[in-house]
Amino acid sequence: EAAVQSILGTSERGLILRTSWVIGPVGKNFALTMLRLHRERDQLGVVADQVGCPTSTLTLAQACWRTLQIAGESQLPAVMHWSDAGAASWYDVAVAVGRIGAELGLIDTPAEVQPITTADYPTPAERPAYSLLDSTSTRAALQLSGQHWQLALRDVLQQARTP
């Protein structure tokens, strides 16, 4: 909250667009890592007790563009949330990457994905167990309906440029 106040306090016109679990067809992100691991391994252990919502760079770009289009015409909230629709665990996303990747011919056979706990996969940064963002008011303000994360994931994988 202090960071929000610091950002908004430095300008007469400021806007923060919060997002989470960003995936896209290029760069390093969870979806492309899972696609690579589905190709390389027979089995994967993926955290199943952290829930959020993947957000495609493709739909995030639409939200950013729409924000810029209407920012001068409309009174937008200073802090908005954007994510694709639905909820998923990292495990759910990994399974979906395998299924969709196989459907699209990006992998031959998906790896078997085993659910594990956060305790089974320690990381330097502590991750929240539940990190969903409510994008309802942002969707209304931007007049965008958004997309379910599985449909957005399909779009990401269709455009993926992985070796």
Language model: regions and residue ranges:
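Glycine-rich Rossmann NAD(P)(H)-binding loop
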Residues: 46-51, 78-87, 141
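Amphipathic alpha-helical segments that line or abut small-molecule/effector binding pockets
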Residues: 58-69, 150, 154
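Amphipathic terminal alpha-helices
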Residues: 148-163
